Amino acid sequence: MEGAPRRPDRHARSEEERHVSQYASRLGRRSPAAPTRRRMLRKPRRVAMLSVHTSPLHQPGTGDAGGMNVYIVELAQRLAAINIEVEIFTRATTAALRPTVELSPGVLVRHVDAGPYEGLAKEDLPAQLCAFTHGVMQAWAGHRPGYYDLVHSHYWLSGHVGWLAAQRWGTPLVHAMHTMAKVKNAALAEGDTPEPAARVIGEMQIVAAADRLIANTSEEADELVRHYEAERGKVAVVHPGVNLDRFRPADGRAAARARLGLPQDALIPLFAGRIQPLKAPDVLLRAVAVLLDERPELRSNLVVPVVGGPSGSGLAKPEGLQKLAARLGIADVVRFRPPVGQEQLADWFRAASVLVMPSYNESFGLVAIEAQAAGTPVLAASVGGLPVAVADGRTGFLVQGHDPAAYARVLRDFADDPALSARMGRAAARHAECFGWDTAASATADVYTAAMQAHRRRVRSHHG
């Protein structure tokens, strides 16, 4: 079937893989830091948070900016609210950036020079990790000893910088994978590029080195243990949150449609996110084509917004999707829109009949929770963390696989029952209330405490 993921045997393990595992485990062991005077705190006072490849100041939905950007910003601000200061280190992407930017009280963004400002693909960033680490160390050198109590790294590139920084500073390392190479490679979209072996090895090293690992869901925790041999006791599950002040039903669907210039009575299936094969926006377009083949009378009352910017390869460019829409004969109902700010994104969610997420993999799927918080149900692939984010049959529908016909059947149900979207939307808003960022920050602070305690025990054990 076109677009079906390739699924290699996950249980087969070659001799080469065993050697890689042993090698990574060996390298991943950190030498205990020299004994330092420890403050017996329940939680850290200041955290160095690392996000090498994407800045929390960038617009989500374009380039490599997405859910992780939102995650870092919201988490950092909520940690600051409970008296944990956060300094976020990220790569500078333009010479015009100030070295430091105060994002909000207690949250500072530090821009690190590492490689050319523009035109550097994410795939080329491993060669710049030495330069990035140098910049982090320079910032640290300007402070008194013990300035940072803990390092929290995001994504494997940051994990390698965090590994070295934590060892040099004598602090614990907490790491969040966000995505994993082995999991992505097991469910590739057609036209997508497999993650390289270097990333697999790098992730295994980080898993071995970290004092604690944060997983978005229990399934992700299981994947860390199964694919990367993580110690079960080191893995903590912390669900991401949603900004319930921003993403809420507010003044409702009719008002949002009026603001966006959308017809009041239309069926509006929305795609919102980066345009890349992994997110599978082409599945939505093909599903719409199937729907209109079966129900041509719906054409005059159908609008399909695609809100997001390019990333990746293959169908990553909007022009590729535009050409696909033309080939499918649905260009007249599809509206391409560039990435928008969070406030306007909330309006797009409110205006939609249903958010469609046919992704091949999602570690959690923040936009699913954001849409539900705004009062809109979700139609999604049953992958990754989406079964946690979406209550199947109550706040949306989960589809096994990526057959456009299966998505078309659900869209037809929304077309035939106009009250279905509103009914599910009310349940979705209630469901999303369980995912506040305050809860996520409190749980993360508990992980920090556990990491600091484990680190102290390890140091004491090493030095008698």
Curated annotation (Swiss-Prot):
CDD domains hit by this protein: GT4_sucrose_synthase (cd03800)
Residues annotated to bind UDP-N-acetyl-alpha-D-glucosamine: Q59, P60, G67, R274, K279, V340, E362, E370
The keyword Transferase is annotated on this UniProt entry: yes
Pfam families: Glyco_trans_4_4 (PF13579), Glycos_transf_1 (PF00534)
Reaction(s) the record says it catalyses: 1D-myo-inositol 3-phosphate + UDP-N-acetyl-alpha-D-glucosamine = 1D-myo-inositol 2-acetamido-2-deoxy-alpha-D-glucopyranoside 3-phosphate + UDP + H(+)
Residues where 1D-myo-inositol 3-phosphate binds: H53, D64, A65, G66, G67, M68, N69, K122, Y155, T179, R199
PANTHER family xref list: D-INOSITOL 3-PHOSPHATE GLYCOSYLTRANSFERASE, GLYCOSYLTRANSFERASE
Described purpose of this protein according to its UniProt entry: Catalyzes the transfer of a N-acetyl-glucosamine moiety to 1D-myo-inositol 3-phosphate to produce 1D-myo-inositol 2-acetamido-2-deoxy-glucopyranoside 3-phosphate in the mycothiol biosynthesis pathway.
Sequence similarity: Belongs to the glycosyltransferase group 1 family. MshA subfamily.
Record note on quaternary structure: Homodimer.
Protein name: D-inositol 3-phosphate glycosyltransferase
Source species: Streptomyces avermitilis (strain ATCC 31267 / DSM 46492 / JCM 5070 / NBRC 14893 / NCIMB 12804 / NRRL 8165 / MA-4680)
Gene name of the record: mshA
